[in-house]
């Protein structure tokens, strides 16, 4: 089987689709797109449906179409805070203890701002 064992016949992919570079998709990412080889999708990025990603997408950016940045999910200070506390790397127990915060963006941001040092200790 070809294509990671999913297709029985051989497929001759065009050269630009050849898998020769690793694609890196970071944490907290939503995708609905075509991602070409060699691209890194930053933490917290959103890639709109049918977007074609040919270059790296910055952390927390929202991209669409030809992966043009439409806007960012958060203000720069919140993005920097999230990069520092890296909540996606918190230990399982800490995540479980604070899982209710993930249902309310404002509560989550307030908690992280007020407890930054504690959050960093749980990475």
Task: List the predicted regions and their residue ranges.
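C-terminal amphipathic helix plus adjacent low-complexity
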Residues: 103-123
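Leloir-type glycosyltransferase catalytic cores
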Residues: 86, 91-107
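Hydrophobic face of beta-strands forming the core of extended beta-sheets/solenoids
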Residues: 25, 31, 35-37, 41-42, ...
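Histidine/lysine/aspartate-rich catalytic loop segments that bind and position anionic ligands
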Residues: 77
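Nucleic acid-binding interface residues in structured DNA/RNA-binding domains
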Residues: 64-73
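Flexible, glycine/small-residue-enriched loop-and-beta-strand segment within the central core
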Residues: 1-39, 67
């Amino acid at each position: 089987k070809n294509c990671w064992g999913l297709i029985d016949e051989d497929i001759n992919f065009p050269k630009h689709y050849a898998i020769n570079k690793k694609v890196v998709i970071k944490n907290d990412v939503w995708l609905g797109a075509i991602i070409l080889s060699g691209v890194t999708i930053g933490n917290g990025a959103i890639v709109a449906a049918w977007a074609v990603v040919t270059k790296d997408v910055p952390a927390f950016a929202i991209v669409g179409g030809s992966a043009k940045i439409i806007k960012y999910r958060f203000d720069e200070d919140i993005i920097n805070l999230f990069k520092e506390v890296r909540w996606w790397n918190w230990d399982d127990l800490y995540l479980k203890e604070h899982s209710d915060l993930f249902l309310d963006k404002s509560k989550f941001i307030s908690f992280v701002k007020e407890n930054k040092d504690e959050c960093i200790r749980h990475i």
